[in-house]
C-alpha cells in the first residue's frame, strides 16, 4: 500500500499548504537609525526576551559561535530559541537541501507556488529594488536560488543559525534572529515574505502572522509552507493508524512524529499553526488568499501516468524517505530532554528506518 505525506506547501517533511497573501496596506516603517551594534554586548543578551534587534548584529564566527550554538549528543543546537530542538549543523543543513529539492519537484521545478503572481510582484522596475525575506532560511538554498534568479532584488534570510558554508550572491545576506522576539525592524520593507517549516519554533502563531503582514509592502505577497506529519493512504483522505497502539498495521513514522509533536506542543510550540495554514489565513490587511495541499510518496515506489511523472514521483519519494529518516534521527535530543528512555527511542528509530523503504 502506498504511503503518502501531504504537503500543503511544509515542515521538515514536505511541502504542505502554501498560503499566498496580499496586503492592501502595511504598518509604517520602523525607524532603525539608532540601531547599530558592533558587539553582542552592545545589543543585549541573546537569551533575554528583551532583545528584539538580534538581526542587526554582525556575526563573527570565531568570536560568537559559543554564544549562539552549543553541542549535545554529537550535534550542534541553537541557543537563542529553547522551543526549537532540531540540530543546527551541517548534517541538518544537508537534510534541508533534500527537503528543498523535494519541494521544488512537487512544485514542478518552481521555487514558489503561483509563479505568475510571484514573478509579477518581483518584476524589475527601474530605480526600485525589490526585496525578499525568507523566515527560517535553514541551509540557505532557497535564498541563494532566489537571489540568482532575481538579481534586481535583495534577499534576506533569517534563522537561529545561518549556514556560512556556501558562496552567497552579493544581493543575498543571512541574519541571526529569533523571530519570536518580533520583526518590527523589518516592517513595510519586502515585496515577498517566504516562510517554510517553522511552526515547531514559533511560540505564538497569530502574532507571527501579524509580523509577516507587517513586513510586507503594499501589494506584496506572503507564502507560508508547512507540512503534515500524518501519512495517508492512496485516497489522500484516510490516514494510516499509528504503530504500537494496537493492531498489526500502523506507521512508525506517524507514531514517532506524533510523540515528537506532542512534546513540542507541551513545550509551547505552535505546531498546530500548520493546520491554520492549510485552512487558509485571514487578516484584515490581506486579500486574494489561496491555499493548496500537495502529496508526496513516503518512499520511491509510486507509479505515475507517464514515464516522466513516474520519474518525478520516485525522485520525490526517495528524497522524502531520506529526509524523514534523517529528521526522526534528529529528534533524539528532544526525546532525551523529555526523559524518555533511550531504549524506547532507539526502538522507535529502528522501526522507522526498517520500514521507510518497505513498500508494504
Report residues per predicted region:
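Oxyanion-hole/transition-state-stabilizing segment in secreted/luminal serine hydrolases
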Residues: 197
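A short His-aromatic
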Residues: 200-202
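A short glycine-rich, Lys/Arg-flanked "PGG" loop and its adjoining helix->strand segment in the class I
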Residues: 206-223
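Short alpha-helix
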Residues: 269-284
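Conserved S-adenosyl-L-methionine
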Residues: 275, 286-299
